[in-house]
Amino acid sequence: MRIALKYGLLITLGVIAWVVVMHLLVPDPRSPVHGLGAGIFINLLHLAGDYLAIKTRKIEAAGELSFKSGLKTGMATALVFAVSASLFFLVAILSVGPKLMAGEPGAENLPVWQAALGAFLGLFVGSLFFGLIYSTVISFFLAKPQRS
């Protein structure tokens, strides 16, 4: 669990840094930097974090990593990232206000709580879904082949 905490929180710190820097440099929340750019950056960060977590698990296991162990490590990392990133965005919306959500499609037509709930569910479920995909692929390549 220590590995998942370490790498999941590192991914979240990268996301926090991206959000803070990009909102300072590009204040318009409708800019493509906040949509497409953030999506690409966050997914690459998530992929790298999952890879490093699974690779660390393999090193700690003296090079003997099973597919199941790699998958569990990657999913635990994705869960830590999903929870901590959701908490960060909750604090950000409560402190900055709903203008942080201005770039979300349809957010201007919904009450703030509904737009925020949709964003949190998307972030949480999306992080777990992509974490499953990334962990599966990474574990497939890093796991020790089973002998018959």
Identify the residue ranges that each predicted region occupies.
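Hydrophobic alpha-helical membrane-insertion segments
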Residues: 74-92
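Hydrophobic alpha-helical transmembrane segments
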Residues: 111-134
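Hydrophobic cores of alpha-helical transmembrane segments in multi-pass inner/ER membrane proteins
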Residues: 45-50, 127-137
